[in-house]
Curated annotation (Swiss-Prot):
PANTHER family: 60S RIBOSOMAL PROTEIN L11-RELATED (PTHR11994)
Subunit and partners: Part of the 50S ribosomal subunit; part of the 5S rRNA/L5/L18/L25 subcomplex. Contacts the 5S rRNA and the P site tRNA. Forms a bridge to the 30S subunit in the 70S ribosome.
Protein name, per record: Large ribosomal subunit protein uL5
Natural source organism: Cereibacter sphaeroides (strain ATCC 17029 / ATH 2.4.9)
One of the record's GO molecular function terms: rRNA binding
Name of the gene this protein is made from: rplE
Length: 186
């Protein structure tokens, strides 16, 4: 049986061994606590068809839970909007917030397995930073992850992936993600 106590995710070990030193050298940080690190990864699925069929949110939450390895939380409408036929507290999507080892494991699977399986993939956009060191991207189909069985998927759903870092600028965050081998186009 595998001993779980000594296990460290691959990207977490890489951060401790090589990424921190490279970032400190590149940006000239005086203190180790200034070095940017990953804070959390938020996965979000908005289910537009949930207005007509609320069961679709449940299946989306199950798929997101399989992808993340953690139970997804169903998100609800804050207020009613008649034009969209949305009522207050109606389930509209689901989300998962990953931290710690699960965050590093997910990022590893995203970079090495899921992104190369995206159709016509050349890389991710390098300009999707928010100005405060957080990176946002979207996937159009959930079955690029190996946890999702293609035959059991009823409907193709996309997802938003937000990678939050402690970096102060976009350049620092981009350098951090490049150290983790994130395939940026520019």
């Amino acid at each position: 049986m595998l001993d779980q106590t000594n296990y460290t995710p691959r990207l977490k070990a890489a951060y401790a061994n090589t990424v921190r030193a490279a970032m400190k050298e590149e940006f000239g940080y005086k203190n180790d606590m200034q070095i940017p690190r990953l804070d959390k990864i938020v996965l979000n699925m908005g289910v537009g068809e949930a207005v007509k069929d609320t069961k679709k949110v449940k299946t989306a939450a199950e798929e997101l839970s399989m992808i993340a390895g953690q139970k997804a939380v169903v998100t609800h409408a804050k207020k009613s909007i008649a034009g969209f036929r949305v009522r207050e507290q109606m389930p509209l999507g689901c989300k998962v917030t990953l931290r710690g080892d699960r965050m590093y494991e997910f990022l590893d699977r995203l970079i090495t397995i899921a992104l190369p399986r995206v159709r016509d993939f050349r890389g991710v956009k390098g300009n999707s930073f928010d100005g405060r060191g957080n990176y946002a991207m979207g996937l159009k189909e959930q079955f690029v992850f190996p946890e999702i069985n293609f035959d059991k998927v009823d409907e193709v759903l996309g997802m938003d992936i937000i990678i939050c870092t402690t970096a102060k600028t976009d350049a620092e965050a981009k350098a951090l993600l490049k150290q983790f081998n994130m395939p940026f186009i520019s």
